[in-house]
């Protein structure tokens, strides 16, 4: 649940409470987009993906990765993390990185402006890495399968994907082909 303060009209309350659906997420693969809910409650999307095993899902819908309409996909019961290029929360889903984690990372990590090519996607945003990490080495095998990219924009074949969350998305390292980075 998120609590947001704002300037309310006269005679109304100043707090809006929005309910987030735990586990509601969207994944983009090279050829499709899947919108689903994690079947196991209480698990964060990033944690489920890092287990590197098929993730059980329900209420799945699929469509092209270009952002066009989705249709029910009754046959989709699981998502393989290795097939996922980009994972992100659905519009009403929980963020992939908590505010506390992001704040801690911001203090102890080096910020880079990055452009990541993971065909057919091009992701631009901010990457927070440990001082010992080199952003150009992200194409090599690492301990983490997914990397959070903050303040992301996603292009698919040169066209901006409109329903990208503003806070962060997860990019699969095994799909990264090229990284261009500069310190902030």
Task: List each language-model region with its residue ranges.
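Conserved RNA-binding domains used in RNP assembly and mRNA/RNA metabolism
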Residues: 2-184
